[in-house]
Amino acid sequence: MSTATIVVCPPLPGSPASYDPTDLVDALLDDPRTGGLRTLSLDVPDPDADDDPRTVRAHWVAHLAIGLATSGVKGPVLLVLGGASGAMSTALGFSQKAARRAVSGYVLVDAVVPSADSRIDDWPDAPVHYVASPAADPLEANQARLRGWSVHEVPDADPTTIGTVIAGLARD
């Protein structure tokens, strides 16, 4: 399934970022292989101070799903998630399925992989790729390998380096 849109997801509120979404989008737009593909990142508002972590995660997924619906994104989409937001890839994928928007793949950058308990029989519904810089938790990268996902080791977390891998995956 070919990709029409690359969606660079912001970090979960309150968690460290694996990449700067704006810089990564810029790097992807500069790569000639992404010509003809729409590339974007959406903003997620800060949570209320009294929101518990479960509510923060639910609002993050909901805001992204609404943002994708209202921005006129064409599927199939390649979802890029980093850090703690990687654990939310199942929920974000299901939100796209509910919107009847196909997902061409998931790219987890130095990310937390979804727990085995959160995986349902119909997820992943598209190929999952793990991009591991030296900053990646080796246990998370190993979990990706054990699940049969492709792991792409990169020498650094520079947006151009990560963007090069993502651009190649978007055109595969």
Which positions does each model-derived feature cover?
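Conserved hydrolase catalytic core segment
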Residues: V77-L78, G83-V107, V112-P114
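Short coil/turn segments at beta-strand junctions that form active-site/ligand-binding loops
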Residues: T3-A4, K74-P76, R101, A126
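C-terminal alpha-helix
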Residues: T164-D172
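The feature captures the conserved acid-bearing segment of alpha/beta-hydrolase catalytic domains
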Residues: D110-G163
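Hydrophobic anchor at the start of a short beta-strand
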Residues: G36-T39, V77, Q96, V128, ...
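Alpha/beta-hydrolase active-site loop
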Residues: L42, D48-V77
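Short, surface-exposed "cap/lid" segments of acyl-processing enzymes
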Residues: M1-D48
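Structural motif
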Residues: C9-A17, L42-P45, V80-S85, L108-V112, ...
